């Protein structure tokens, strides 16, 4: 009975032009395996995303690179085992083509081998998580674009209290005045908070939405200045797309030289549709 079902399925695949005649003949000649084997599951979270965003579709054509996906999964699972000893049981990875935003490899979570059965089904690429310091480059870009900041302009890094809010750096060290480019490269918290206050929270939220972030649904007053230090939630997918467009824009204009005030031309952060 199993052999008949197998052969019938192979013939259906041939009739649908999914396999050629040589593959059909070779497959029909193959004996049945001694036991059932699990179906291949190369990118289960991405498949679930496609099913969710394209209901009723039974077949999907993607831009994924199968070799890259397999290599990413191998490295990903190996590293996740190391991190599990530190109590880190969830992680995600996404690789895109920066020029188009096309997804080339997608790992939504760790533990797909059964090690983390309780939470491995959660797709962290699409899940909302604290932004941490990921929004700082966008604040710097917004201020450069608007003429509020120069790369070598000195920004203040001193103990700061704004109302009841007292931000601090990751290490208890204050540098006084530092170039804006250095403050960004060191991911200093206090300069970022002071810059957000100068630029305006509401204005920055509008800028983030233009960048493609859809998760900022509360008011500027609700987010407050902690927004720049992880007080808001983003998804990894939207962050990767936004960073790709940030990179694309930076690569198409001359580098800043000294204190020269080169205005950044506004640019779209969402990938353009490709047929």
Map each language-model feature to its residues:
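Active-site SXXK
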Residues: 8, 13, 72, 101, ...
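Conserved catalytic neighborhood of penicillin-recognizing serine enzymes
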Residues: 37-52, 149-204, 248, 252, ...
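Flexible glycine/proline-enriched surface loops and loop-helix/loop-strand junctions
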Residues: 53-57, 119-125, 175-177, 185-192, ...
């Amino acid at each position: 009975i199993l052999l008949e079902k197998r052969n019938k399925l192979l013939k259906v695949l041939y009739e649908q032009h999914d396999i050629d005649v040589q593959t059909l003949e070779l497959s029909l000649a193959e004996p049945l395996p001694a036991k059932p084997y699990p179906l291949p599951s190369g990118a289960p979270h991405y498949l679930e995303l496609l099913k969710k965003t394209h209901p009723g579709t039974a077949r999907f054509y993607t831009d994924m690179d199968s070799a890259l996906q397999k290599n990413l999964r191998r490295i990903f699972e190996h590293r996740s085992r190391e991190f599990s000893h530190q109590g880190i049981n969830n992680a995600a990875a996404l690789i895109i083509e920066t020029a188009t935003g096309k997804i080339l490899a997608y790992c939504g979570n760790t533990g797909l081998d059964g090690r983390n059965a309780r939470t491995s089904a959660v797709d962290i690429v699409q899940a909302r998580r604290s932004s941490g310091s990921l929004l700082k480059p966008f604040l710097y870009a917004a201020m450069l674009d608007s003429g509020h900041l120069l790369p070598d302009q000195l920004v203040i890094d001193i103990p700061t209290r704004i109302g009841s809010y007292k931000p601090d750096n990751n290490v208890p060290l204050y540098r006084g005045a530092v170039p804006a480019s250095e403050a960004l490269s060191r991911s200093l918290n206090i300069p970022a908070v002071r810059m957000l206050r100068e630029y305006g929270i509401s204005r920055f939220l509008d800028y983030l939405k233009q960048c493609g972030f859809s998760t900022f649904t509360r008011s500027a007053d609700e987010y407050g200045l902690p927004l720049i230090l992880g007080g808001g939630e983003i998804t990894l997918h939207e962050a990767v797309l936004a960073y790709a467009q940030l990179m694309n824009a930076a690569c198409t204009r001359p580098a800043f030289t000294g204190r020269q005030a080169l205005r950044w031309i506004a640019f779209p952060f969402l990938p353009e549709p490709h047929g």
